[in-house]
Regions:
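Glycine-rich flexible loops
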Residues: 1-173
Length: 173
């Protein structure tokens, strides 16, 4: 698929989760929304070698929008930079929660609460509905059962305003 926006990060918790055999687990609302969009690419070094690109593309496939570079960090793709940003935001939040949950249970994955297959299926259906609504430019707020996920553009603008307020516009652009 064509990609307009791409976002790569070395976010601490996302990089840490990329170093685990489990990858991103469907244990938080954020991770359940994205887990079916994730593909993995084995570590080959610093990812600067042009010959690695075809292998990365093959591992990503035509349907996935998130590529976890193992032992490195996530890369998200979107129809816009806002789409790619929102996916990265969800990846990083998922990894934050997972890192804390894994630490809380001493790494014993059997002690983590994983939603039932029925809940995962319902959330997957809701996430699919949200994606279709955003593509059509429709609202996906709580009023129509969308779960309150705002559009990627609104999230991106809100985060940009937060950064401007925190650091000053001259420091972030």
């Amino acid at each position: 698929h064509d990609c307009v926006g791409c976002w790569h990060s070395h976010h601490e918790n996302a990089a840490a989760i990329s170093m685990t055999k489990t990858g991103i687990l469907p244990i938080s609302q954020e991770s359940v929304d994205i887990v079916n969009m994730i593909a993995y690419h084995p570590f080959e070094g610093t990812a600067n070698d042009m010959s690695e690109r075809p292998r990365m593309q093959r591992n990503l496939g035509m349907e996935k929008k998130i590529l976890i570079l193992e032992n490195h960090g996530p890369c998200t793709l979107g129809n816009s930079i806002e789409d790619a940003f929102l996916l990265m935001y969800l990846v990083c939040r998922s990894c934050n929660y997972q890192q804390k949950a894994m630490a809380a249970v001493g790494g014993d994955l059997s002690k983590l609460n994983v939603p039932s297959p029925q809940v995962l299926s319902a959330m997957k259906a809701r996430a699919k509905m949200n994606v279709l609504a955003v593509k059509k430019g429709e609202s996906i707020g709580f009023e129509n059962g969308g779960g309150g996920i705002p559009s990627p553009f609104l999230v991106f603008r809100a985060m940009a305003r937060l950064m401007e307020d925190t650091y000053g516009a001259e420091q972030i652009y």
